[in-house]
């Protein structure tokens, strides 16, 4: 899979592309990440890529020319990060993980010239209902969520029980020591009875989801009732 990242701040991604799962996937040539600087496509001698908004108002806007020129040099599904976009979730991550190539545009300032969105983008994505200075942090989160779903990146058994796979949150997990300052690990987990451990974990997933995320609980019940 190839992921193109269009940004004003390519250095944001230097450590991101070297460390953890992303770095490992790149070294193993499972994925390619191509970071593109909008400024490289500016026709301004000072590499300026922003300007004032027509009609007045505070802030600056990314200009259409350098953004479109950058877009035309890359392929795949074109995705702009925007507060107006579809909310990113695990189901979107799964769909994007099936693509051979995607391009992510990181906004900045007051966003993009609307003509970019209307004519050169396939769709918009939002990480949630909050404001970030730019799209770089959101891009990293989205890329991480996508890459870990690709084959041979993470143990498939580890993915099966992860939160959101079946609309249930994960079960509580514990490690050594079994007793820390009187705080004990549930006895069932050290019983060696794998059937009881499995039942306990499923029960905990349902209890936690029902309590903490009633919206996910409703989705889980709908799927469960259809079976």
UniProtKB/Swiss-Prot annotation:
S-adenosyl-L-methionine binds at residues 107, 127-132. Pfam families: tRNA_m1G_MT. GO terms for biological process: tRNA N1-guanine methylation. It catalyses: guanosine(37) in tRNA + S-adenosyl-L-methionine = N(1)-methylguanosine(37) in tRNA + S-adenosyl-L-homocysteine + H(+). It is an enzyme of class 2 (transferase). It is found in: Cytoplasm. Gene3D superfamilies: 3.40.1280.10, tRNA(m1g37)methyltransferase, domain 2. Its EC number is 2.1.1.228. InterPro entries: Alpha/beta_knot_MTases, tRNA_m1G_MeTrfase_C_sf, tRNA_m1G_MeTrfase_TrmD, tRNA_m1G_MTases_N, tRNA_MeTrfase_TRMD/TRM10. Keywords: Cytoplasm, Methyltransferase, S-adenosyl-L-methionine, Transferase, tRNA processing. Its main location: cytoplasm. GO terms for molecular function: tRNA (guanine(37)-N1)-methyltransferase activity. GO terms for cellular component: cytosol. Specifically methylates guanosine-37 in various tRNAs. Belongs to the RNA methyltransferase TrmD family. HAMAP family: TrmD. Homodimer. This is tRNA (guanine-N(1)-)-methyltransferase. It comes from Mesomycoplasma hyopneumoniae (strain 7448) (Mycoplasma hyopneumoniae).
């Amino acid at each position: 899979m190839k992921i193109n990242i269009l940004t004003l701040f390519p250095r944001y991604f230097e450590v991101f592309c070297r460390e953890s799962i992303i770095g490992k996937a790149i070294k193993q040539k499972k994925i390619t990440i191509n970071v593109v600087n909008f400024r490289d496509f500016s026709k301004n001698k000072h590499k300026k890529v922003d300007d004032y908004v027509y009609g007045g108002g505070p802030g600056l806007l990314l200009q259409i020319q350098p953004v479109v020129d950058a877009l035309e040099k890359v392929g795949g599904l074109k995705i702009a990060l925007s507060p107006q976009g579809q909310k990113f979730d695990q189901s979107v991550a799964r769909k994007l993980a099936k693509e051979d190539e995607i391009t992510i545009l990181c906004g900045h300032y007051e966003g993009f010239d609307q003509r970019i969105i209307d004519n050169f983008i396939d769709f918009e994505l939002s990480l949630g209902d909050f404001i970030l200075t730019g799209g770089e942090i959101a891009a990293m989160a989205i890329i991480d969520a996508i890459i870990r779903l690709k084959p041979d990146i993470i143990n498939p058994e580890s993915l099966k029980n992860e939160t959101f796979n079946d609309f249930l949150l994960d079960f509580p997990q514990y490690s050594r020591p079994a007793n820390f300052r009187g705080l004990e690990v549930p006895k069932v987990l050290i019983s060696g009875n794998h059937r009881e451990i499995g039942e306990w974990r499923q029960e905990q997933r349902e209890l936690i989801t029902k309590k903490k995320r009633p919206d996910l609980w409703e989705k889980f019940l709908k799927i469960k009732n259809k079976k």
